[in-house]
């Protein structure tokens, strides 16, 4: 749940009323306030509440080359909604020499945590399964432009990309990464399982 200040700043940024730097300042302020609350409640591990993210998984997955987002409209409970889904567009890899917003977000959180004794910053990232769920099951693709139908090669590259990304966070002082994976719930969804069967 994002604070109203961030929601309003995001809206203003989208409408061109404020700059990216001004939006970041609002996020910084709210994240610092959140960490202060977490410490006050004696939590040994603190997070930034994912306050910088628009989507819990896509903002993270966009850190990888070969992965992009696709804007769609979808009817949900009778209402037309704008949604984004991830799509594999090329070879998936993590380039640590590029500028990564998620690493910058980590650096700021880490700097806040270091102000408090006995407090460790925790980085939350989405699990790799979301790449496959979005590209194959949500979008109904049976192959990718780069890998074709060779899913095993894609799996290998995604695993390597995650290893390289985690190593980069380690180099930036991260010692606690939480990998969030919501895909387990799909395993008890008959509609989902039928989609898996249909895709082979």
Task: Give residue ranges: language-model regions.
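Domain-level signal for soluble alpha/beta catalytic cores
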Residues: 1-200
């Amino acid at each position: 749940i994002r604070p109203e200040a961030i929601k309003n700043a995001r809206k203003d940024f989208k409408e061109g009323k404020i700059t990216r730097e001004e939006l970041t300042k609002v996020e910084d302020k709210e994240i610092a306030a959140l960490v202060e609350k977490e410490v006050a409640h004696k939590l040994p591990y603190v997070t930034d509440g994912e306050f910088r993210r628009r989507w819990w998984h896509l903002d993270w997955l966009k850190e990888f080359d070969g992965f992009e987002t696709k804007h769609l409209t979808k009817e949900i409970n009778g209402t037309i909604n704008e949604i984004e889904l991830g799509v594999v567009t090329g070879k998936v890899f993590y380039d640590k020499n590029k500028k990564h917003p998620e690493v910058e977000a980590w650096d700021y959180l880490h700097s806040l945590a270091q102000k408090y004794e006995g407090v460790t910053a925790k980085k939350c990232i989405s699990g790799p399964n979301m790449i496959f769920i979005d590209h194959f099951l949500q979008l109904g693709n049976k192959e990718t432009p780069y890998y074709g139908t060779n899913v095993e090669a894609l799996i290998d590259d995604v695993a390597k990309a995650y290893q390289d990304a985690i190593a980069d966070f380690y180099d930036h002082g991260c010692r606690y990464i939480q990998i969030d994976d919501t895909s387990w719930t799909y395993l008890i969804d008959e509609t989902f399982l039928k989609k898996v069967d249909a895709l082979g």
